[in-house]
Amino acid sequence: MLGFLLLTFLTVYAFVAALLATTRLRYGSRAETLLTACLLWNFIILLPIHALGVAGVLYRSTLGWSSFLISSAVIGASFARVDSWEGFLREGWQTAHDVARLPFEALTISFQRRSLVFVGLVAVLSVLSWTAWMAYLAPSDAWDGIWYHETMIGYAIQNHGYATMHLPMNLTQQANGYPRNCEMTGLWFVIFTDRRLVELPNSLMAVATADSHCSGLVTSRCT
């Protein structure tokens, strides 16, 4: 339970940092704001993972503290040279509020206008919510997950970094040279807890991307 609480705190804290940094960019579109915040959040959690992984000191404790410090640094940088800290906090809160309302407004407006976009939104959000729930309930049995995705995650945790894995000289060597951003995002969700959330990032990022793109089709008022 403590592991899940720590994961929740660090994940939310990193997203708050990303959202505050995105607020400084002042996008006119809420969809763009959401996508940018998700990308920055991903960067914030991947930066310490890659740095610690290359150094061979990727432990739960080092990652937790590194992530906290990086998120704090991003939050601090977001407040740099603002006219009023209180005013910027209100602006950040408004940004979070607007982004949170985006999917609900998209559904409401598309329904009121009897738009086919409503059907698409409901279908996409339902499928992605279902797959996120199933990712938690059932282990992955897809060929690529067992082949190299989860292999890379497991060995990175076991070896406390990106040490070369001693695998047969066949296609399993992909686990030694494949790009790691997706896998290390998955590592973020399991290193503090267990493997139940290893496939969750796929659904989370897909929800943000699909919601932003579909919502942008409804009306400029939603974005």
Describe the predicted segments one by one:
Residues 3-4, 66, 176, 180-184, ...:
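Loop-to-helix entry region of an early transmembrane alpha helix in multi-pass inner-membrane enzymes
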Residues 1-108:
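Membrane-embedded, hydrophobic transmembrane alpha-helices
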Residues 19, 49, 151, 183, ...:
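Transmembrane alpha-helix boundary and packing residues in multipass membrane permease domains
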Residues 13, 43, 177, 205-212:
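Residue-level signal for transmembrane alpha-helical positions in Major Facilitator Superfamily
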Residues 17-18, 72-80, 197-221:
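Transmembrane-helix motifs of polytopic, lipid-linked glycan transferases
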Residues 138-152, 158-185, 193-197:
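Extracytoplasmic catalytic/substrate-binding loops of multi-pass membrane glycan-assembly enzymes
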